[in-house]
């Protein structure tokens, strides 16, 4: 696991291309859904992966935009360099990877997606893409801030209002505006099926994360790049 991610051509400052630098970040664990036997402790593997021992730097160059979704935007990126313990590990990586950047409002949700990749690690490279890490940083830490224009956030087709349901009436009871299904409070005092007996969720730095307009969080998942782009087209000529 790399501790630092550099992405070239990922921003502009005064019209000139600029790089961004992100640090490895813990993912955001889910609560546990109990059908019965409530209060059981969560297994240690349920927690986010320990990133304290991460080392090395992965350097990429942003290439082409793939697609925009509800919470993020995907790009291809070229692997420029990969060093760990002063050893060049680039030969162990593909030439090109996939980057999924969170939109400004959804870094918490992307942190949860990173946790799912950690949980299904044995399936990586088999039925799901290989996960190379989750990285994030406050925008204020980037050189050129606040005059930096972050490329993945430009030309946004779908706004927050277009892709998100109306906030719940009791959103003030939720730990974050970027709420997830396990944030929903119990209905009228009924016991919730979602529990956090081991504290993994509430102890996460993402538990009360919220989007800050003056200093948004940049976050990205680095994944194996799979096959051709899915166009949504159907027909005998489309495989």
Language-model regions: role of each:
Residues 34-35, 47, 116, 154, ...:
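Short linear interaction motif-like sites in intrinsically disordered regions of transcription factors
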Residues 38-42, 93-99, 184-188:
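Generic detector of short, locally flexible boundary/turn motifs and exposed helical patches
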Residues 121, 128-238:
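Conserved structural core of kinase catalytic domains
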Residues 46-48, 105, 196-200:
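Short, charged, low-hydrophobicity "junction" segments
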Residues 1-68:
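Juxta-kinase regulatory segment immediately upstream of eukaryotic protein kinase catalytic domains
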């Amino acid at each position: 696991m790399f501790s630092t991610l550099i992405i070239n051509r990922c921003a502009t400052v005064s019209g000139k291309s600029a790089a961004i630098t992100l640090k490895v970040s813990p993912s955001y664990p889910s609560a546990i859904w109990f059908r019965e036997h409530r209060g059981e402790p969560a297994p240690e593997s349920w927690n986010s992966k320990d990133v304290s021992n991460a080392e090395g730097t992965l350097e990429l160059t942003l290439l082409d935009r793939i697609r925009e979704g509800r919470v993020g935007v995907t790009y291809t990126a070229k692997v420029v360099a990969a060093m760990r313990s002063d050893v060049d590990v680039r030969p162990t990586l593909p030439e090109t990877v996939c980057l999924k950047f969170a939109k400004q409002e959804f870094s918490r949700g992307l942190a949860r997606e990173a946790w799912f990749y950690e949980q299904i690690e044995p399936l990586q490279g088999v039925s799901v893409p290989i996960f190379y890490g989750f990285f994030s940083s406050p925008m204020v830490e980037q050189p050129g801030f606040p005059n930096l224009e972050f490329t993945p956030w430009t030309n946004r087709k779908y706004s927050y209002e277009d892709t998100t349901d109306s906030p719940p009436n009791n959103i003030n009871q939720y730990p974050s505006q970027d709420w997830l299904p396990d944030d929903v409070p119990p209905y009228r005092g009924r016991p919730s099926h979602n529990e956090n007996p081991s504290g993994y969720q509430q102890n996460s730095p993402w538990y009360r994360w919220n989007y800050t307009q003056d200093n948004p969080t940049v976050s990205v998942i680095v994944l194996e790049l799979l096959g051709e782009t899915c166009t949504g087209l159907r027909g005998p000529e489309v495989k």
